[in-house]
Amino acid sequence: MQKYGSKKIGATSATSSNKQKVQIELTDEQRQEIKEAFDLFDMDGSGKIDAKELKVAMRALGFEPKKEEIKKMISGIDNGSGKIDFNDFLQLMTAKMSEKDSHAEIMKAFRLFDEDDSGFITFANLKRVAKDLGENMTDEELREMIEEADRSNQGQISKEDFLRIMKKTNLF
């Protein structure tokens, strides 16, 4: 949904683990920053960049894409040339920014649970939140929730565990 005469452009994205669509709006400043990164790495001025240039341009915008992620991104929009144009790049970066926003929201939620700032959600943290929300949950139910999310068997939920679980819920 590109509007050239307006202040913002929107793009819809869906992450592979999250089929829910997220609509974000780019400001003119963000669009300009993306355009500058694209132009900087479009060395030959062809209006297209290849996988290597895509990776460097994404890094310039603050992302750390893996080689496989780059291949997947390009194969999803490539017309056989192995290169993508600015509009495709803009769409990819809008999707990545949307993912970044969702990560920030999940971390914000984590901090609400992690009241003692320990870096973990403990049984006591979970019990407090359940009580604050008026959820009548038994200690056993709360312990089961922690066990379900806790991959390292520490009896508490790490940021990584919380992020993984929240991404599975399709809420973010």
Curated annotation (Swiss-Prot):
Its main location: cytoplasm. GO terms for biological process: cell division. CDD domains: EFh. One of its GO terms (cellular component) is centrosome. Residues 12-21 have a biased composition (Polar residues). Residues 1-23 are annotated as: Disordered. Pfam families: EF-hand_7. SUPFAM superfamilies: EF-hand. Keywords: Calcium, Cell cycle, Cell division, Cytoplasm, Cytoskeleton, Metal-binding, Mitosis, Repeat. Belongs to the centrin family. Monomer. This is Caltractin. It comes from Naegleria gruberi.
